[in-house]
UniProtKB/Swiss-Prot annotation:
Residues 1-13 have a biased composition (Polar residues). Homodimer. The keyword Repeat does not apply. This is Protein GrpE. Belongs to the GrpE family. The gene is grpE. The lineage of its organism: Bacteria, Pseudomonadati, Pseudomonadota, Gammaproteobacteria, Alteromonadales. GO terms for cellular component: cytosol.
Amino acid sequence: MSNDSSKAKQNQVDEAVEGEIITDNENETVTGEASLMDELTQANFRVEELEQALEAATAKVDEQKDSVIRAAAEVDNIRRRAAIDVEKARKFALEKFANELLPVIDNMERALQGTDAEAEATKAVYEGVELTLKSFIGTVEKFGLTVVNPQGETFNPEHHQAIGMQPSPDFPANTVMMVMQKGYILNERLLRPAMVMVSQGGAAVDTQA
């Protein structure tokens, strides 16, 4: 009887010990899981911080890239505007210079018109003025100056200025029958219109063009 009682007590002790072991194991498991979760949480926070830092760095790089692109575009614009300004200044200076030369050309042409090319007394003068005029015209043409001499051409109000109209059996209507003063174009821009007399008939001509 005493043996049975001893066995029963021993069993109770064993069960109590096993219960404590199980409890300790469960506590260790819970503690381990909590520690693992804490490590995972910290790792997630770290990943988020790194992602935010990466996004900030990427945004900074994009911003700097945009700044560089804008700066390069602005430099190109400045260069383009400077080139345009230089070209305008060059054309303006050339136009002003050409305008000063036109009266000289007109005077030489009038001198030729008023000089007898066949007379012995004036032949040498005529040839000298003619040669000078041709050389002068050839020089200014190198800089883009073009003579507008529309004798026999259809009246063009963009390049010609009609000073009058006359009936003529020798010219169709609206044809330049006489050039009173030559015109000039500088680099495709009208410097001075040609002063012309236009044949009468057909469509009317705007003499104020």
